[in-house]
């Protein structure tokens, strides 16, 4: 038994000693073993055609299972010991990798079985017509995103690559020996692989395989080192780094490019005059094509210093030297050492003209590209000059520049600015929220014109409930509209449309959020969508601050209008995914008493089908309820919190109670709180099931007095519950972790109310916490 189980067993024993046994006949109390075995949804997917849904159920310890469902909610197939699962591009297949059983592997490890003798994974290719192909001894696999093909390797000592269609009736299949790496293009059936070759037919090098035509092309022959192999989006172009000296300590990389499946040519060689003097192509810099594939971005860096391989390691000096006035603390330098050694600076190769331009350097190292790399200007920034002052200011200033992707020329936009600039999708504007004045700004990349979009009087952009000794955060943005014409900004409740040049008045698109105290937020269902289309219907999620319930709403942002309610109530809605080619969605619905089972519906939510039945796990166990309560703090503020009561609650009885909290949690009234043997907090269902009440009060802070703020908020809440007559005043405990751990430790110095207090990983020193 591990320490986690030991600790929870101790809690079970404590419960047995401290609380009376609840008189129950039909139901049982949860145990630690129940928590460990509790099945949760750890993954879900809907096919592109919306006809099939796969869901992964997984215990906290043990083997997961993937279940396949059709649109009527019928379970079609089950895949035990499941790991990864993916639908094919055509939606005709489900591919599932399976692990060997955990108990079997654990027993073999106990017997000291060698690693190469342990069982391997398997790959199941399941046709949605019912056929099943199983590939044993799986090492790794990749599924193409746009065609029904899979590539895989199997066997520990065999590095042969197998590439085949998912349709087992097709005889087409390709094999390549001694393959080191492989991958498919994002939007085509093109596959690259790197092989050491064999003595018969396959030369060593980088190959391109067109799975749709069967044509295989040797892109670059060589047994050297290949790095950063990258397709453009459509798979028409392929770029990579190559060094022929595979056994040298330092890999002198050059940049190669293959276009339209032709053999690759070297486009940026080592020592290219366009690179800064003494700089080289970095093997750690990410290769990236622009959206149009007219530009190829790569990383450069100063040539790294080489170790003296003629000197023994024990004869090398092993000292660490730093000075008191360094702008970055030595501990931070030491922590980031490996990251800094691999740091690279972006450059661009213009494919059509062959020109090379260095964009970033050591002085201006951070870069943001606009329009997926096709914008004429990029945004450069650095916080290097302000590293020292950031230690006591608590935030970092930055300098911002535009840089031309054509010639590398730079123009200063802002100096010593606290804002974190971002780029609009097409790269026409930089935009940011200024914490120091709680306003949103834009800046034209073309002419440097700065525009203030909001003022503290005209628009409440900030967190109105901020209660920490710092500037309030923004509520964020919903995104940009097409052609960078408008920026959609959230306030506490609504979504507003702003003209980035402030030539038009802002428009409240959702209109009634603040009036009804519903916080609307845009749900992005298409992961590839870069902008918000004002003419398309949009899905919003709404949170009701009064009831704590959730809903989905329909809106169309072409005109301002109150969103149309689709589904809303006293529950939590989340984990929504849409089929790519239809309006079908999957989502979860939950409350404290209702398991977050997976549901299937169309976007109007008129008919919803429950697919999974995780709630069945509860039927044999005592299950508590959640209730919203309110009271007045000692300093006169109205507060809310949640009381979790045991099953079959009897107000005439006295119950032991645990107070557990972390800042504000009343908005989680309808969270299921998945049963879990957690390392840092109590499990609410476990304690409810064993006869305890759990109280989670909201804590609102006054600057400089976090502990006393906790006392002022929590104590009258506890008194309010005691006043109801069902709390055993001699059996009240408090539990908190980290920031909550600090506060329960403070409570121990202010009151004798609590019979026991557990303070987990508490903040021991406010000075040290600020220093971090």
What are these regions (language model features)?
Residues 574-772:
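Serine-hydrolase catalytic core recognition
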Residues 23-585, 590-596, 600-601:
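Beta-propeller folds
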Residues 2, 14, 132, 167, ...:
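Short intrinsically disordered, low-complexity coil segments enriched in acidic
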Residues 5-12, 44, 576, 704:
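Alpha-helical transmembrane segments
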Residues 1-27, 763:
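Bacterial Sec-dependent N-terminal signal peptides
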Residues 20, 46, 308, 673-675, ...:
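Residues in and immediately flanking transmembrane alpha helices
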């Amino acid at each position: 038994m591990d320490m986690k189980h030991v600790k929870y067993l101790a809690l079970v024993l404590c419960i047995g000693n401290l609380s009376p046994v609840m008189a129950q006949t039909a139901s049982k109390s949860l145990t630690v073993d129940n928590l460990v075995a509790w099945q949760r949804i750890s993954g879900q997917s809907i096919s592109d055609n919306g006809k099939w849904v796969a869901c992964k159920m997984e215990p906290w310890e043990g083997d997961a299972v993937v279940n396949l469902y059709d649109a009527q909610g019928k379970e079609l197939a089950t895949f035990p010991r499941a790991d990864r699962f993916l639908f094919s591009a055509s939606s005709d297949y489900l591919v599932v990798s399976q692990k060997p059983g955990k108990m079997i592997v654990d027993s073999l490890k106990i017997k000291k079985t060698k690693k190469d003798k342990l069982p391997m994974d398997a790959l199941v290719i399941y046709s949605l017509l019912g056929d099943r192909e199983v590939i044993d001894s799986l090492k790794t696999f990749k599924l193409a995103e746009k065609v029904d093909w899979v590539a895989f390797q199997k066997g520990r000592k065999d590095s042969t690559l197998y590439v085949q269609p998912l349709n087992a009736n097709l005889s087409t299949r390709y094999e390549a020996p001694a393959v080191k790496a492989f991958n498919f293009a994002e939007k085509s059936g093109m596959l690259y692989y790197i092989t050491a070759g064999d003595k018969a037919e396959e030369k060593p090098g980088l190959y391109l395989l067109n799975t749709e035509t069967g044509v295989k092309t040797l892109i670059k022959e060589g047994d050297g080192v290949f790095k950063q192999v990258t397709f453009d989006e459509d798979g028409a172009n392929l770029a990579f780094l190559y060094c022929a000296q595979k056994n040298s300590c330092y890999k002198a990389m050059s940049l190669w490019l293959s276009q339209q499946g032709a053999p690759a040519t070297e486009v940026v060689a080592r020592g290219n005059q366009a690179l800064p003097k003494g700089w080289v192509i970095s093997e750690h810099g990410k290769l990236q094509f622009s959206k149009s594939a007219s530009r190829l971005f790569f990383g450069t860096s100063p040539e790294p210093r080489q170790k003296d391989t003629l000197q023994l390691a024990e004869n090398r000096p092993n000292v660490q030297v730093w000075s008191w006035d360094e702008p970055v603390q030595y501990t931070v330098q030491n922590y980031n050492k490996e990251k800094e050694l691999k740091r690279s600076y972006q450059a661009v190769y213009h494919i059509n003209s062959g020109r090379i331009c260095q964009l970033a350097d050591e002085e201006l190292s951070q870069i943001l590209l606009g329009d997926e790399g096709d914008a004429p200007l990029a945004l450069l920034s650095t916080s290097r000059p302000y590293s020292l002052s950031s230690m006591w200011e608590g935030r970092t200033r930055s300098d911002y520049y535009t840089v031309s992707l054509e010639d590398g020329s730079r123009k200063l936009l802002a100096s010593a600015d606290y804002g974190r600039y971002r780029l609009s999708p097409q790269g026409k504007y930089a935009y940011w929220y200024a914490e120091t004045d709680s306003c949103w700004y834009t800046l034209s990349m073309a002419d440097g014109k700065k525009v203030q979009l909001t003022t503290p009087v005209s628009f409440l952009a900030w967190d109105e409930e901020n209660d920490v000794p710092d500037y309030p955060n923004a509520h964020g943005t919903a995104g940009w509209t097409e052609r960078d014409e408008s920026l959609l900004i959230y306030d506490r409740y609504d979504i507003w449309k702003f003209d980035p040049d402030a030539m038009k008045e802002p428009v409240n698109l959702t209109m009634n959020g603040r009036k009804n105290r519903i916080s609307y937020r845009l749900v992005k269902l298409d992961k590839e969508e870069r902008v918000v289309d004002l003419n398309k219907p949009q899905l919003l999620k709404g949170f009701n601050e009064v009831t704590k319930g959730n809903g989905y709403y329909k809106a169309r942002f072409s005109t301002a209008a109150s969103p149309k309610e689709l589904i809303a109530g006293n529950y939590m809605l989340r984990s929504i995914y849409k089929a790519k080619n239809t309006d079908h969605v999957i989502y979860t619905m939950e409350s404290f008493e209702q398991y977050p089972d997976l549901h299937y519906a169309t976007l109007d939510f008129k008919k919803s089908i429950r697919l999974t039945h995780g709630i069945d796990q509860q039927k044999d166990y005592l299950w508590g309820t959640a209730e919203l309560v309110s009271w007045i703090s000692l300093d006169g503020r109205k507060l809310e919190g949640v009381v979790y009561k045991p099953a079959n609650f009897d107000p005439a009885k006295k119950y032991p109670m645990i107070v557990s909290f972390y800042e504000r949690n009343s908005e989680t009234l309808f969270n299921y709180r998945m049963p879990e043997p957690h390392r840092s907090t109590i499990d609410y269902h476990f304690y409810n099931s064993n006869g305890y009440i759990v109280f989670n009060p909201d804590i609102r802070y006054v600057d400089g007095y976090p502990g006393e703020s906790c006392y002022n908020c929590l104590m009258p809440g506890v008194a309010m519950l005691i006043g109801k007559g069902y709390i055993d005043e001699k059996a009240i405990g408090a539990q908190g972790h980290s920031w909550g751990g600090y506060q329960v430790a403070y409570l121990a110095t202010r009151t004798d109310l609590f019979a026991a207090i557990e303070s987990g990983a508490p903040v021991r020193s406010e000075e040290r916490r600020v220093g971090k």
